[in-house]
Amino acid sequence: MSELSIYLDFRAQPGEPPTATDYDDGVRLVQAAERLGFAHVWTTEQHGVDDGYLPAQLPMLAALARETSTIRLGTAVILLPLTHPRRVVEEACVVDVLSHGRLTLGLGAGNYPNEFRIFGADPSGRRQAMDEGVPFIKAGLSGGILPDGSPVNVPPVQQPIPLVLGGLLRGPAGRAARLADGHFAYSYLDPELELARFYRETLRPSLERHGRGPEFRLIFASVIWASDHAEREWRETVGPAFIYQQRKYAEWEAGMPSAGGYAFSGDVDDLRKRLLIGRPAQIADRLLGLREAYPFCEIVVWARLPGVPAELALAHLETLAGEVAPALADRPAP
């Protein structure tokens, strides 16, 4: 069985910071996802940008913890080189207590130059920050004594809080296989090809080398749109929103080696052919085919891209829950 989850950055309109009403709409989407049986709400972060991309994941998840009761709450991912590992542990444990044990902590290295500049961090130190920070944090996720000899102020409910790591290169994949409970991947354009290649060439060898079995969670995020009116909705609303999202990523990534395939070309109709866009039955079949090559246990769907009305995003969640999720549940994972 594969679970469906949602991904949110809490942007509502292209180029505009969110209002309190926009945040309220985001909370309602999460509550709807919980009611519809989605497994997780995952958040993400960026810093120093002009369009309201969420900069503070754990505070947001603390708020969502009090507005929900069953859906799990995940960070995908906290940019560890930009913060102190102790602060991550302490805030994560508080969220786990507030949520009665529903947090999954996702960590990553980041790669956008401006974020490192505004935090006074050296991008060349990302690997060291992860190599030192991840074991420190992992030691605290059960609420015990940290490697510096000091206690965690507030022990978590879960023993331990689950830990996942992101990153599509060999080093991050190996670190996840060695230290984490799972790996968080993302793939937008040509996901069937890209994820199969990543698993075959990078992740599976790391998992085999470290003796990881079926308990290791493979999670991936993508832009998916399942609708009986998929072509029209893509052309009029979802496609322009996706292009805005990807252009902002490319803008932020300028000057850095590609770490996830953000560069793209073509118009809205050309791009549609490279994404998981189609009728619900078509999307279910494609996801089942992808699972043969990339044995994921959880699919994370962008719940609302900037510019997609909240009502349309909600209707899409209902379609996913009613027509795509049952097909994934009916056929066991390989």
Predicted features, each with a name:
Residues 40-64, 79, 111, 187-191, ...:
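Glycine-rich, proline-tolerant flexible connector loops at the mouths of alpha/beta enzymes
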Residues 119, 123-153, 193-297, 329-334:
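An alpha-helical appendage that flanks or caps ligand/catalytic pockets
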